[in-house]
Amino acid sequence: MLSLALPCRSWAHRLPAALKFGLLAVAMIALMRIGSLAGQGAAVLVVAALTASLGRKAIRQSLVTLRPLVWIVAVILIWDSLQGAVAQGVLFGLRVLAMVGLANAVTLTTPLPEIVALIERLAQPLARFGISPRIPAISVALVIRFVPVLRARHDTLAEAWRARSARKPRGKLLAPLTFSLLDDADHMADALRARGGLALPRKGRDTVGT
């Protein structure tokens, strides 16, 4: 399974995954409690500086991640402006940019196996109720991994459509995209079954899938 983490090593890569996600949770709570434009603006600058300290590749990847979000924030800002709540819209936009930027920085500096291992450790109490801790761990890993895969697959299909037609595809890419993802899901299910599935690990065996 591929990871979204940057291949280069930075100071943030050396931090334990538990520490990074713990600090991320605290930062998210703090951002929700900041109610001033100056405070949220300062938070965005701090997140930008943090991302810049990770290197040029981190900056480029963060910009790619935030690009679709800018349009969503712009639409919300326009709506709030029409409602006479410009300050509220700006505050919301800054908060979202800071949160997503910070979460993206953690994702870029934490290899996927470390994320899976962390979630599996946190989910160990579920084993008392007969629920395998691997289920939430693998579920989160699949979501993180397949979101960019879905976007890349859509871009590939759209490029193939443009090579054959000058018309916009509109919803005509939905069927081939769905079938290709279902095929990937079948292969993923076979791979999971070959590695023991998601059942509770037996005693004496390693509980962290790699």
From Swiss-Prot:
Residues 1-10, 55-71, 120-210 are cytoplasmic. It is found in: Cell inner membrane. Its main location: membrane. GO terms for cellular component: plasma membrane. Keywords: Cell inner membrane, Cell membrane, Membrane, Transmembrane, Transmembrane helix, Transport. The chain crosses the membrane at residues 11-31, 34-54, 72-92, 99-119. It is a multi-pass membrane protein. InterPro entries: ABC/ECF_trnsptr_transmembrane. Residues 32-33, 93-98 are extracellular. It comes from the Bacteria. It holds the Pfam family CbiQ. Part of a biotin transporter holocomplex composed of BioM, BioN and BioY. BioMN complexes can be readily purified, but not BioNY complexes. Only the BioMNY complex has ATPase activity. Probably involved in biotin uptake, although complementation experiments in E.coli do not indicate a clear role. Belongs to the CbiQ family. This is Energy-coupling factor transporter transmembrane protein BioN. It comes from Rhodobacter capsulatus (strain ATCC BAA-309 / NBRC 16581 / SB1003). The gene is bioN.
